[in-house]
Amino acid sequence: MCGFGLVTSRFTFSYKMIYTVHTFQKLPISLQQAWDFMGDPKNLSVITPDSMGFNTLSGDDRKMFAGQIIIYTITPLFGLKLQWVTEITHVQDKHFFVDEQRFGPYAFWHHKHFLKEIPGGVEMEDIVHYKVPMGILGRLVHPFLVKPKLDEIFAYRKKKLVELFGEFKTERV
């Protein structure tokens, strides 16, 4: 691989200005329960902070399927209301799905959601590749506005999922 990489926390910066968020979470539920929850677009509002002003406009009336278009509004910063159009591009039942932004606040957004059965529950893995808009200005505000907002969103989601399903307990030997 050519280029350079600077890693801070769970975000990666590359010479092409594509950033990466990579998170893991274990929950004490079955793979089927996790899939049923994560595969229902209505639940996105449940695991999104209220401060984001998340509101689904269309596309959440069915379980997730490849080709599904979901349209919603968000208010991520400074009270600015934005429309976000997402397409579910890939689905493998009880294993993974991919959502990609078609129109919205990012220059690029590709989010892979993986589910894996583990002893005592399920492990969820998220890999998001994204690019901020507005060229150099976007890159300058990324560490002060975009990255902290994404940190907040994923931390809220993790906390909310624990509230809903309980904390995963690791057995000590």
Give names to the regions the model predicted.
Residues 13-65:
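Hydrophobic ligand-binding cavity/cleft-lining segments
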Residues 20-22, 81-85, 108-111:
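Short, surface-exposed coil-to-beta transition loops
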Residues 27-29, 76-78, 90, 105, ...:
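Beta-strand elements of well-folded, non-transmembrane domains
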Residues 31, 89-96, 114-123:
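A short, structured loop/turn motif at beta-sheet edges
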Residues 56-103, 156-159, 163-164, 168-172:
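Glycine-rich portal/gate segments that line the openings of hydrophobic small-molecule binding cavities
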Residues 101-152, 172:
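Beta-strand/loop substructures that line and gate deep hydrophobic ligand-binding cavities in soluble
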